[in-house]
Amino acid sequence: VGKRVASDVVNMYDGAASCVSAASYFFDDDGVEAGKTNIIKNGILQTGISDCLSAMELGTAPTGNGRRESYKRKVYTRMTNTFFDAGNDSVEDMIKSIKHGYYLCQSNNGMEDPKNWQIQCTAGYGIEIVDGKLTDHIVAPVVISGSVVDLLNSISMVSKDVHIFGMGMCGKGHKEWVFVSDGGPYLKGKAKLS
């Protein structure tokens, strides 16, 4: 907390009260009022998310992220509506600024390795960009992988437009499924694609 984990243009939030979606609620499963947590502000890590137990162990206030699949399950700290905040760039200007890259569409899943700070996400397809213009070359599916900190620090542009889609699910292995939302603005960054 208090350290740089991303470029200056990165602002990230989580919270059941941050937008209206399938992952929104008034109180978490610990009875804590839902809120909007500013995780990263101008590239600096502000805080994490927590349930009551983890907040007590860390000596912090709970963030309203105590969630469980059903009454039969234990409460864990879980994401809700996690997204990047809007930036100042138009998607058109972002595309024009790219010599060679891909415009990725239809993000559909992801997973992280919290011990090694690695991430892997997939997109339904990507449209190749050459000399600032979209081409007719489409690749599908696209896997995005790499170090979370490297990816966050590579973000140089963030679009003004933000779109949140609220019908995702997040699980812990093969169990503990809860509703989550994804989306956000378009980001210009560098990552390994395959």
Question: Locations of the language-model features?
Answer:
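N-terminal small-residue-enriched
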Residues: 1-194
